[in-house]
């Protein structure tokens, strides 16, 4: 069984779509009213509201710095979530390797938001994609020098570069393009 992600029509919710009726709800064309958009990214997901025990088990280092996290879901930011699930301070270390133009803004972005646009899925104009990939891969190459591959083991860090790209996509497309968010769904095929 493999989970696949699909763009769906705007008037549909994820729960309406099943494996059997998927073709009826797939997004096959972008509505003309969006012709002046540069890009489309997935509707965001909210990452706050983790169970208290999970915050204690996986976010204890962050709790030592700021115990109020456990009582304030707004403090369960992208940065906090990344620390819990993909290695403490790995996102901060990676951000330090970003180009100067994006470093401080992205740091601010991940420290103050508790949602992001998931799955590294986008639809964009060719020139936008070219700029996105140039910026992303030059950063990820620098990250490879810092993190390598051999030390990245298990769920937490094995796919570290994909997790970094996923968080960066939200920031980059919102900063650099006229974007719109579109619904998506996951179907087990």
Annotate each predicted stretch with a short phrase.
Residues 1-189:
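ER/Golgi luminal nucleotide-sugar-dependent glycosyltransferases, focusing on the catalytic module
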């Amino acid at each position: 069984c493999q989970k696949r992600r699909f763009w769906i029509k705007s008037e549909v919710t994820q729960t309406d779509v099943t494996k059997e009726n998927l073709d009826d709800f797939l997004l096959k064309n972008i509505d003309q009213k969006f012709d002046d958009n540069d890009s489309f990214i997935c509707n965001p997901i909210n990452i706050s509201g983790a169970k208290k025990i999970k915050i204690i088990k996986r976010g204890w280092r962050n709790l030592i710095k700021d115990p109020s996290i456990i009582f304030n879901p707004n403090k369960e930011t992208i940065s906090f979530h990344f620390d819990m699930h993909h290695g403490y301070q790995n996102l901060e270390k990676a951000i330090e390797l970003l180009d100067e133009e994006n470093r401080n803004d992205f740091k601010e972005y991940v420290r103050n938001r508790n949602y992001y646009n998931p799955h590294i899925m986008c639809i964009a104009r060719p020139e936008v994609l070219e700029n996105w990939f140039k910026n992303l891969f030059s950063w990820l190459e620098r990250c490879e020098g810092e993190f390598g591959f051999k030390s990245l083991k298990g769920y937490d860090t094995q796919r570290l570069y994909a997790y970094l790209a996923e968080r960066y996509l939200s920031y980059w497309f919102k900063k650099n393009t006229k974007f719109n968010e579109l619904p998506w769904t996951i179907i087990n095929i």
